[in-house]
Amino acid sequence: THIDNLDDFIEYLKLEKFSLLVHDWGGPIGFGYAERHPEKIKNIIISNTAAFTFDWIPFRLKIARLPFLGRFLIEKLNLFAKFATFMTTTKPMKKNIKEAYIFPFLKESSRKGVSSFVKDIPMWPEEQSYELLVQIEHGLWIFRERPICIIWGMKDWCFKRRLLKRWLEYYPEAEVHKIKNAGHFLYEDEPEKILNIVSDFLKRNNSYEKVR
C-alpha cells in the first residue's frame, strides 16, 4: 500500500521525529503512517483532506469512477490531470505551473495510478480500502493532545466545509485557518499566506515535548 511506501521512504531517510502535513490522499496515507509510529509525530498540519469515512462525493468524481467511461476519460484523454489545472484553484494557473502538473501524466501508462486512486475512493463497506479507512478513523484520537493546525481552502468543490467540521469533531482544540478565496489547491491560490501560517505554527510548536 501507499502507507507501506511512505513507511519505507521515511525509514530510508532515517527521520526520527518530524512535523506531518497532509493534503488530499495524503490524509489517509499520512495518518495511516502516523498511527503506526505516533512517537515520530511532533505536530500535524491538515489541509483539504479526509481520513475518515463519508458517504458523499461530487458528481464529477462519480463520473470518473464509472467502470469504463471513467477509465477512458482518465487514461485515454488525461482529463483528470488536465481538469485539475483549472478546477482546483480560484486563480488561473500560469502556463508553466499547468505544464508541471500535467508532465507526470504525458503517457497513457502513467495515468493508471490516477485511475486506480479514483476507483479506490472508499465509499461503501464492500470496497477494497474501506476497512483500512475505518481503522485509520478509529486511530485519529491518538493525536488529540498534539499541536494540530487546520488550513482549509473554503472554495474547494470536492473537500467541502462539511469535512472541515468533521475534522473539528476529532480535534476541537485545533488551530484553524479558513482561506476564504482558495480552492482545493490552496497552496497555489495563496502560497505566501499559507507559508506564513505554516512557518508560524512550526516555530510555536517545534517540539511536542516542549508543548506538553
In which residue ranges do the predicted regions lie?
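Catalytic active-site module of serine/aspartate enzymes centered on a nucleophile-bearing elbow/loop
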Residues: 173-212
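Conserved hydrolase catalytic core segment
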Residues: 16-56
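Amphipathic alpha-helical segment in the mid-to-C-terminal domain
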Residues: 2-3, 160, 187, 191
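Active-site acidic short loop of glycosyltransferases
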Residues: 11-17, 38-39, 145-146, 173
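Helix-rich cap/lid subdomain of alpha/beta-hydrolase
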Residues: 56-116
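Conserved serine/cysteine hydrolase catalytic core
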Residues: 110-169
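Active-site loop/oxyanion-hole signature of alpha/beta-hydrolase fold enzymes
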Residues: 1-22, 196
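Short beta-strand segments
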Residues: 21-23, 45-48, 115-118, 149-152, ...
